[in-house]
């Protein structure tokens, strides 16, 4: 759950470091404020200064929409060239609800579980890979998006459509998670094929 303030952020950073020492990959939802988290701190995060990661085991996820066009990033998704690692489906995701029900939800908290699922798939087939390796496989094997998109949260009265930016400016990787490509890259790393 993304917040603007953390009374015990040092505890969270220690927990991240502990998870790293146990080779655990943490998949973190970037948040749903349509803002650049490179300039506006949100918690939890894996950086004390918005520049340097405290550990290489946290994968922060932005949400993509159902559209493969300028509306690809979800209009609510947080983004950041330094602090969001990759995007994943996060709009109208069919999920469970209490009392054995189902409903469609949107948010980076829907994008993070699909990414965690891909990470689990990679690690189940290739258990010798470290958390850090899996993180970088997901970031580097995703579908590269090479077109302009509407920057999330940029629509205004003066500019109802919003500001156009290259998708690659919204995350470290400029990519969308892709399970097949992740498995192929993992296989190449492990088996050298």
Label the predicted regions:
Residues 57-60, 126-193:
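C-terminal subdomain of the subtilisin-like protease fold in secreted/lumenal serine endopeptidases
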Residues 1-8, 29:
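Short acidic, glycine-rich surface-loop motifs adjacent to enzyme active sites
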Residues 10-21, 116, 120, 132, ...:
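Solvent-exposed, polar/charged alpha-helical surfaces in well-ordered, non-transmembrane soluble domains
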Residues 28, 32-53:
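Glycine-rich, charge-decorated loop segments at or immediately adjacent to ligand/cofactor-binding or catalytic sites
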């Amino acid at each position: 759950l993304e917040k603007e303030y953390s009374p015990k952020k040092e505890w969270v950073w220690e927990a991240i470091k502990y998870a790293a020492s146990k080779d655990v990959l943490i998949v973190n939802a970037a948040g749903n404020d349509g803002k650049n988290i490179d300039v506006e701190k949100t918690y939890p995060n894996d950086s004390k200064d918005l520049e340097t990661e405290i550990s290489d085991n946290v994968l922060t996820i932005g949400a993509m929409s159902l559209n493969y066009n300028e509306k690809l990033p979800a209009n609510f998704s947080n983004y950041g060239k330094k602090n969001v690692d990759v995007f994943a489906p996060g709009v109208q995701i069919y999920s469970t609800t209490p009392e054995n029900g189902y409903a469609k939800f949107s948010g980076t908290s829907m994008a993070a579980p699909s990414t965690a699922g891909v990470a689990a798939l990679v690690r189940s087939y290739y258990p010798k890979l470290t958390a850090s390796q899996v993180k970088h496989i997901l970031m580097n094997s995703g579908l590269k998006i090479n077109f302009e998109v509407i920057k999330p949260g940029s629509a205004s009265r003066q500019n109802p459509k919003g500001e156009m930016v290259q998708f690659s400016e919204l995350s470290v990787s400029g990519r969308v998670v892709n399970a097949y490509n992740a498995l192929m890259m993992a296989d190449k790393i492990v088996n050298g094929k």
